[in-house]
Amino acid sequence: MSAGPGCEPCTKRPRWDAAATSPPAASDARSFPGRQRRVLDSKDAPVQFRVPPSSSGCALGRAGQHRGSATSLVFKQKTITSWMDTKGIKTVESESLHSKENNNTREESMMSSVQKDNFYQHNMEKLENVSQLGFDKSPVEKGTQYLKQHQTAAMCKWQNEGPHSERLLESEPPAVTLVPEQFSNANVDQSSPKDDHSDTNSEESRDNQQFLTHVKLANAKQTMEDEQGREARSHQKCGKACHPAEACAGCQQEETDVVSESPLSDTGSEDVGTGLKNANRLNRQESSLGNSPPFEKESEPESPMDVDNSKNSCQDSEADEETSPGFDEQEDSSSAQTANKPSRFQPREADTELRKRSSAKGGEIRLHFQFEGGESRAGMNDVNAKRPGSTSSLNVECRNSKQHGRKDSKITDHFMRVPKAEDKRKEQCEMKHQRTERKIPKYIPPHLSPDKKWLGTPIEEMRRMPRCGIRLPPLRPSANHTVTIRVDLLRIGEVPKPFPTHFKDLWDNKHVKMPCSEQNLYPVEDENGERAAGSRWELIQTALLNRLTRPQNLKDAILKYNVAYSKKWDFTALIDFWDKVLEEAEAQHLYQSILPDMVKIALCLPNICTQPIPLLKQKMNHSITMSQEQIASLLANAFFCTFPRRNAKMKSEYSSYPDINFNRLFEGRSSRKPEKLKTLFCYFRRVTEKKPTGLVTFTRQSLEDFPEWERCEKLLTRLHVTYEGTIEGNGQGMLQVDFANRFVGGGVTSAGLVQEEIRFLINPELIVSRLFTEVLDHNECLIITGTEQYSEYTGYAETYRWARSHEDRSERDDWQRRTTEIVAIDALHFRRYLDQFVPEKIRRELNKAYCGFLRPGVSSENLSAVATGNWGCGAFGGDARLKALIQILAAAVAERDVVYFTFGDSELMRDIYSMHTFLTERKLTVGEVYKLLLRYYNEECRNCSTPGPDIKLYPFIYHAVESCTQTTNQPGQRTGA
């Protein structure tokens, strides 16, 4: 490129590859698919250049198509020439250019804006003549003209001397972004007489935007034959990289057969299940938030208290935001410390220092490079490609000849900075630039058949209870284990006897305040009309022993001992269910059989639950083992809303505990409520017709010591992943994950109806945990062993339907518990997508999953596999692929295999399997994968100004690991520091 008449040409010029140096008209369409070459009018200034649409397959590590606009940012010619004159690389020149190489550098410093404008017009005239030539010139001249045309469209890439320049040389076409605010001092005419209409409406706003323009750099001194050969190879490579992946559609699950069955009777009417035929197919994919019904956002992060109780609301919870105080400062320091530790995937110190210097000088002129195929020696820094407006991970600054000199405020000041002594150094740099290094290709996961319904280790090979478990010790009460039955009288098939024989009352802040307690007083009027404190339990008995033939009778009975809420509680859902949903025969069976039996078992509470039930408070490691009959009595009391002190809001005594009384289940006209009531009445009918004989254990586990994730050297365990089936249906005998609210049960007693609430409905014995389990802290979980499934269902959220009664055939262990182990672990609720990639948030989720999976003192061969899925996604805002990787890492440290259910998402199934296979084949440790997660945040998410980063997590990991592997295999090189 010429600097115009009377100006000395650049001593360093950019090199262009074979695609750029071939004859323009002949190779333009081949080398740059989609590029539209314009014949520029000499009067047009400035010139607008169009960005070729890039394929998602060719752009390294990018998810989706190129986000550049078709009308890219207009670059001013003086700006380009200034960069070229100071930092350019030598290139082949035409005869007119060679005649100017002997000019004095003083002329370069005296260049004026007029001369620039003259050159601008001169250059456009040459570009205009390109389309009119017969292409009979020499290859050098043709390449020169084609070179000039593209030099007006993009910035020159300046490569530093030394190893860094060699690493930059290795890269394929970088995207160059010019920061327009930093050229405010350039003496260039900013007006444009003629241009497309798309640019005239955004002349002023264009200066505040950044666009990416693709530039090809190559060695112009190579012969044309070599260039043509490289061009052919580049076409072959691009064809492979751009090959579209076959779309794989997930198979839809078949709808559950409709059985005409009533939850109130084994021979119920046919109309109870009429809504099942039209129900939507099972959609358990919690990560599909976009199609969630209006209630789904309320249900999963449901508050166990009223809507005004912000403390108990997961959506309004402040606890989730307290995870990382000092969001930027604390995470920057912690992630920086981790990054300084030895690793196979550690970026080089030179690149780190360069990134720090470039990001700290916002007023300087910067070029942002997006690498497509190249790789730095550490193999990691080039993966970061930011959206416009974000800070790039690799900023190459314009520097003087010594690379560390003072920066001028004007680009034209650089013209006076090229001493003659630099000629020798430039020649040496030029020789280094000609050295080509092996390029690191983009990693593409192997193609997986779309017909596969599962991937990984066969589920039959996964460990299950009780076969993999050890023999349990004799059941005995201890300081950290409360047992409420006579262990000496425990027999198979017999109803356990309560212990002690007679009711023992403790009315304090360490135990559940029971409805039958003598301390449960209530203001009553005596015969003289005077108010006195009476027994509330006696009032409950009197109210419930009346005939409950109508829903209004049940409402009046409940409000008799809850007078304070007579004007607050709403029973619309209960009344509508009784009058509009149930058939006459079903309603008759309800008030003639089921409700009287429920009243009977509820009022037998002091004879069934004789031992005070301890509260499972925070920081406790304690277990409670009770009989299924005792749980049924407690839940019957919850249905009739008899538990005292559990209805107050805000800062009351039990404000840190979930709801237990069912009053919120009776309110409103939601279509969910009738189905929830059907499921619960099915349970009460079953347990009142035949007393259950098993035991259930509730364990609160609180950990103080967690792994140092960045130093963990354990390898990943086995994985089975499928898009069919459910956790409860196909994970028998495994550790089944409950995607819990920190108030266990979430909205099960109100409007919630997603994964956790559904599990609590079909296994209603889980609901009693809300009676004594305080809100979970970040280092805690709740483990429930022995609950029984009583119902089957179809649908999810708004489409949930009770289907039929279920006979649980799970085996029992030595303690007469069903071998169904459920762990409640609560994920964080992310209001911003990027927040979940903050290092401390990732550590918190790892620690939470690890807490749920760990069983201290139990060897790995005696631990069952973890049956899980899209934990913390859906309404909680989590990324399914990140959460899957987090659970895989936590399970590896806890020495458990993983069985992962994607709930109908076949693409997610293939992605998780491909990532797990990729990591295990390369024998990456948990610590190395954890460091990659930190790298992803630092390079892609920390400074991202858009809702989500351009490069997704899995492509980033693929490229990072593959790049490091390729670089390590090169002789004479080593990675990390």
Swiss-Prot record:
It comes from Bos taurus. Poly(ADP-ribose) glycohydrolase that degrades poly(ADP-ribose) by hydrolyzing the ribose-ribose bonds present in poly(ADP-ribose). PARG acts both as an endo- and exoglycosidase, releasing poly(ADP-ribose) of different length as well as ADP-ribose monomers. It is however unable to cleave the ester bond between the terminal ADP-ribose and ADP-ribosylated residues, leaving proteins that are mono-ADP-ribosylated. Poly(ADP-ribose) is synthesized after DNA damage is only present transiently and is rapidly degraded by PARG. Residues 317-332 have a biased composition (Acidic residues). The keyword Endoplasmic reticulum does not apply. It is found in: Nucleus. This is Poly(ADP-ribose) glycohydrolase. The active site is at D738, E756, E757. Residues 611-796 are annotated as: Catalytic. Residues 1-457 are annotated as: A-domain. One of its GO terms (biological process) is DNA damage response. Substrate binds at I727, E728, N741, Q755, Y796, N870, W871, G872, C873, G874, A875. The modification Phosphothreonine is found at T200. Residues 280-291, 333-343 have a biased composition (Polar residues). Transmembrane segments: none annotated. Residues 1-69, 184-407 are annotated as: Disordered. Its EC number is 3.2.1.143.
